[in-house]
Structures are given as C-alpha cells and as structure tokens.
Amino acid sequence: MAAESSNPRTVEEIFKDFSGRRSGFLRALSVDVDKFYSLCDPEMENLCLYGHPNGTWEVNLPAEEVPPELPEPALGINFARDGMQRKDWLSLVAVHSDCWLLSVSSYFGARLNRNERKRLFSLINDLPTLFEVVTGRKPIKDGKPSMDLGSKSRNGVKRSIEGQTKSTPKLMEESYEDEDDEHGDTLCGSCGGNYTNDEFWICCDVCERWYHGKCVKITPAKAESIKQYKCPSCCTKKGRQ
C-alpha cells in the first residue's frame, strides 16, 4: 500500500491533510519508534515511511504505478539504518519526511492562488518540523516563539491568565520596531495579507490564527470586552458539530 490519497482543495483541507500525515510521522518517530526501527530491516528492499491523513504511519515499498499518484517519499530509508547511530538515522528520516510533507502539500496546493499559498505556508511554518521535534530543538506542542504568551491582539491589549484585559501601550510601543521583524511573515487568516504594526490584529483563542480586525469586524474597543475570541471559521465548525 502506497501513500493514502485524499483530495483536499482548500487551504484548510490541505493543512488538515498535512497535519494528519505529520502526526503519523511523529508517532512513528516517537511513541512507536521501536516498532518503526525494527520494521526498517536493511535486508529488505527499498522501503519508504508513509504518513497518512488519518494520523497513522506505514513502512512499505514504493508505489508500483509510474508516475505515482502522489510524490513519493525517500526510497531505501532502511539501508542506512545499521550504518549510523540510531538518533542520527532517525534525524535523517525526519528530514526526508519533512521534505515529503512539503512536496505533498505543494502538489495539492498547485491550484491555489498566491495569497492562498502564502496562508498555507504560514500555517505549516507555525508548526515545528519533524527534525526539530526529533532532535529536541522544539517541543511537539509549540506556539509561535516570537509572540507573547497570552497576547491576543496587537494594538496593546494583553490578556492576563485570569482572562482579564489590561492595556500595555508603553510596552508595545517600545517593542514595535522588533515586532516588525519578528512578525513580518505572519499572514491574516482571512485575506492572507502581511502583518504591519500600524493595523489592529487579533488572534483566535481556538485555532491561534491571526486576523486583521477589519477582516473579522473586531475593533480595539470590542476586543477589550471579549474574554475568548473565536474566529468565524471556528464558530462555523462548532455550529456544524
């Protein structure tokens, strides 16, 4: 069995597919690592590690059809297993798996427009790579390292742990110059536009995506009175459940 195929079309669907496959890889390289290691017998033929959209993983031979329906992962990951230290081999597999995840997402995203591709890459880039997780450079549960923990809007409103809001304009003004550099690659989850410090932004407490206030019809004054902000997409998902 080769890579399980789905047919995601939208940014959200492609990111969901990416996240599912990534979860499968993470499981193979952490929780199920002993099983994965034993399956990669160097005496076997060219083996590949597949991550599936449902969060499962599989070690198998590559697809027989040429060209394959999806881009293929690295061939022969089993051959190098006994010639390297275990941690180095797992790191190598992680790097190749990162490359495959990006290639599959690029394949599905071929028909997206420029802003949609930027949104998709921004969502993907918010997650630590498999290599970072395997080597311990970043934990599996990773927020944006450049954002203040608990900060939900960029106009100087910071949420405290108790859910209350307090204005910190001086702190934000002092950090605007650095913030431009840190958040320059952040994209609005609605329009796909880049972050600039002269606009009001707000972050969804559920999916943690950032939005222009004008795109989701939230003003700085209204943000002050919101204890937990949910973006339109998360509100819609909850309504369907």
Swiss-Prot record:
**Species:** Arabidopsis thaliana (Mouse-ear cress)
Job of this protein: Histone-binding component that specifically recognizes H3 tails trimethylated on 'Lys-4' (H3K4me3), which mark transcription start sites of virtually all active genes.
Q: Which UniProt keywords apply?
A: Acetylation, Chromatin regulator, Metal-binding, Nucleus, Transcription, Transcription regulation, Zinc, Zinc-finger
**Any one of the GO CC terms:** nucleus
> Domain comment, in the record's words?
The PHD-type zinc finger mediates the binding to H3K4me3.
> Can you say what this protein is called?
PHD finger protein ALFIN-LIKE 1
- State one Pfam family annotation: Alfin
Q: In terms of domain of life, where is this protein from?
A: Eukaryota
First-listed, main subcellular location of the protein, grouped into a coarse class: nucleus
Q: In which tissues is it expressed?
A: Ubiquitously expressed.
Q: Which subcellular locations apply to this protein?
A: Nucleus
Give the site residues for Histone H3K4me3 binding: Y195, W201, D205, W210
Which residue stretches belong to region Disordered?
Answer: 142-182
Question: Zinc finger spans (PHD-type)?
Answer: 185-237
Q: Would the keyword Coiled coil be found if you checked this record's keyword annotation?
A: no
MF terms in GO? methylated histone binding; transcription cis-regulatory region binding; zinc ion binding
